[in-house]
Amino acid sequence: MDSDFHVKPEIRILGIDDSALLNEKVMIVGTVFRGGDWIDGVLRSEITRDGLDATEVMVTMIKNSRHHNQLRVIMLDGITYGGFNVVDIEELYRETGLPVIVIMRSCPDFEKIRSALKHFSDGEERWKIIKKAGKIEKLITGRNGTPIYIQKAGIGAKNVEKIIRLTSIRSSIPEPLRVAHLIATGITLGESRGKA
């Protein structure tokens, strides 16, 4: 069921991205934003590279945060973290009670993903989680007409669009994700690089 709620200009959003894949444990960083204007906090945890613990770790990180009760939405940079550690967005929504918006710069190449998953003994399980995330929709945010691609859990399309437009201030990628990416790569690599 999709949550229907009024989107306030200072809606509290948690954007989560992962760091560079340098070790067996991969850092994930969450930034708590009020709308797209300012950051209220930073969360950090670790997941297993190519593991299956991303959903559980995110749930724990969110529920144990002092920001949990203020948050209204979770934003993810895709559904695979730390290599092929797939996030079950339906479970993340169910366990945290927070709607989930997945943002992608480009539409995933499912043939390549399916092929890569053949190298995992539990590739079919991962594939089911990927397919369970639902339909990928194209959205033009108004920033240079550049499209982004989204998936969602627990939130309607109109609210997704409102939230993305509200938070996409400097690029087509919402600020909570853009800043989470900068922090995660900066901490891991010594300097931020790449695109969220």
Curated annotation (Swiss-Prot):
Gene3D superfamilies: archaeoglobus fulgidus dsm 4304 superfamily. NCBIfam families: PRK00766.1. Belongs to the UPF0215 family. This is UPF0215 protein MM_1007. It comes from Methanosarcina mazei (strain ATCC BAA-159 / DSM 3647 / Goe1 / Go1 / JCM 11833 / OCM 88).
